[in-house]
Amino acid sequence: MSKKLFIQTLGCAMNVRDSEHIIAELSQKEDYSLTQNIEEADLILINTCSVREKPVHKLFSEVGAFEKAKKRGAKIGVCGCTASHLGSEIFKRAPYVDFVLGARNVSKITKAVNTPKFISTDINHDESEYAFGEFRGSPYKSHINISIGCDKKCTYCIVPHTRGDEISIPSSLILKEVEKAAKSGAKEIFLLGQNVNNYGKRFSGVQENIDFSDLLVKISEIEGVERIRFTSPHPLHMDDKFLEIFTNNPKICKSMHMPLQSGNTKVLREMKRGYTKEWFLDRALRLRKMCPDVSISTDIIVAFPGESDNEFEDTMDVLEQVRFEQIFSFKYSPRPLTKAATFINQIDDKTASERLTRLQNRHSEILDEIVAAQKDKIFDVYFEELRANGGVAGRSFNNFLVQVDGSEELLGTTQKAKITNPKRMVLYGELQI
């Protein structure tokens, strides 16, 4: 009889893929099977995020709840970025935790499960060529890591301290994984990296003469691959070659995440982002011109230390010019180990909240206009999900979530849908037979 695994994943798509790797390792090597019922689990894992303070607080509230809900003899493990930066502190604050496994140490999961009070948080551990077992949360798409770690050292970001330096995964391994996924029915390939379009700058073994644009072309040539998505690219590496391949390759989905963070060049310099307001606008507006149907999402931090009212207005100006389809916006959150946490000119919470509210309110107005403009458009939709309220949903080529009436027979297929009732979260439509 197999043992039961309950796993909760917080944070980014990289964490989702790490959790898939953990599930594969434990199911194939330790005979675990997944359960959604925490009370029957023999092993309870939480894969954590530490980009902001809130997910760190959530970790300790969640593991406390796990301890109360778990059955006798069940183990609790903490994985991911918070595990990397807190390490043994987790044992002190939650002594009922059985092991701590950092984000760069996923391949050690079987050892962790079988070793009392195991801890491994080595951010220099190299997993770029480790052959993980295969598990996909969805049969219709496959998340695939193309690099690990981050070299950028942005002053507000803890990720380089939890995931280590950037290493590209050999292209031969990536292509084999894509081929395997496509043969098993995954028509959409989702490429992952902290700076995904910096791919090819450094390998741990044999160096390759390849960049991200080249890799995209190679993946698009694999039989069975119909759609390619990726996250998260860095604006600094969006050269003309990259934009041209993105625009002209018919298998690359026309949605681009462009993390702005701030629209002010001085603030960007303090953040160590490596680009200016002018560079960002040039890339974004050129992309809009080259690819009119593209949807652009972004990340924005308001109230970074020292940000003046006028500097915040530059962020609002970029919002007006680019008109992002989606924004992920936050008040600046000081993170341990980061340079910005030591800056003396921190912004008070009242000012930060006012700026965030203004930004989000204006984007809501822009989004309403964007959504309304989708009425009567016809999209090719790749259906992946049965909805609780009936019908099936999937993504358009430019990343709108579309729902139509239909059954599970539509899952894993691409169909044309005409938008009849566009809403912010979902565009409701009708199949075009």
UniProtKB/Swiss-Prot annotation:
Domain MTTase N-terminal: 3-118
Span of domain TRAM: 372-433
Main localization of the protein described in the UniProt heading: cytoplasm
Gene3D superfamilies: Methylthiotransferase, N-terminal domain (3.40.50.12160), tm_1862 like domain (3.80.30.20)
Binding-site residues, [4Fe-4S] cluster 2: C150, C154, C157
SUPFAM superfamilies for the chain: Radical SAM enzymes
NCBIfam families, alphabetized: miaB-methiolase, MiaB/RimO family radical SAM methylthiotransferase
Protein name: tRNA-2-methylthio-N(6)-dimethylallyladenosine synthase
Species of provenance: Campylobacter concisus (strain 13826)
GO terms for MF: 4 iron, 4 sulfur cluster binding; metal ion binding; N6-isopentenyladenosine methylthiotransferase activity
One of the record's GO cellular component terms: cytosol
Cofactors required: [4Fe-4S] cluster
Keyword Metal-binding tagged: yes
Keyword Transferase set for record: yes
EC number(s) recorded for this UniProt protein: 2.8.4.3
